[in-house]
Amino acid sequence: MSTYTTEIDNVATLCQQQGEAWSAINPESVARMKLQNQFKTGLDIARYTAGIMRRDMENYDNDSSKYTQSLGCWHGFIGQQKMISIKKHFENTDRRYLYLSGWMVAALRSDFGPLPDQSMHEKTSVSGLIEELYTFLRQADARELGGFFRELDAARESGDEVETARVQAKIDGHVTHVVPIIADIDAGFGNAE
């Protein structure tokens, strides 16, 4: 059974247990929302991306051709578009990270305006940018899965079982846009302002 189908069944069981009070809840709609929001907290993202980084470091230690690429960004939208493009061209985000440069954060993300020194930005600048980036990356997941759900509905409506199975496999095999973010030391903590 697919992940999506299992999620629907779990919600349907829960709705039945709650009786009439939950009878208007559509289990498939709930399952879709859960899949579109797989990361509930920053800690979920941290655990997920730490696992990726550990795996990538081990792979690199065993084979130096398995290096990672870090793509610089200074705004959530930029990071989102980079990951959407990478997934479109490579079908996954394997060994692709986002990168925050100290000078870029100071020049483009400082709450006090552009600052001359790469380490002169507020200590909240980087954490705010990371939160923004992960919000945009999670939105990219929701958008992509929403498209898959529309395809699934159309395939079901047309009665095309082959297309339904193909789209179902896309949903179950969905690869998130959420990737590790690397920051150089100057992008780390900023000043104590």
Ranges and model annotations:
Residues 130-133, 169:
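Extended, non-catalytic scaffold segments that flank or surround catalytic motifs
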Residues 2-76, 84-91, 147-176:
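N-terminal amphipathic alpha-helix/helix-capping segment at the start of soluble metabolic enzymes
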Residues 74-77, 82-83, 93-129, 136, ...:
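Glycine-rich, proline-tolerant flexible connector loops at the mouths of alpha/beta enzymes
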Residues 181-183:
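Residue-level marker for buried hydrophobic side chains located in beta-strands
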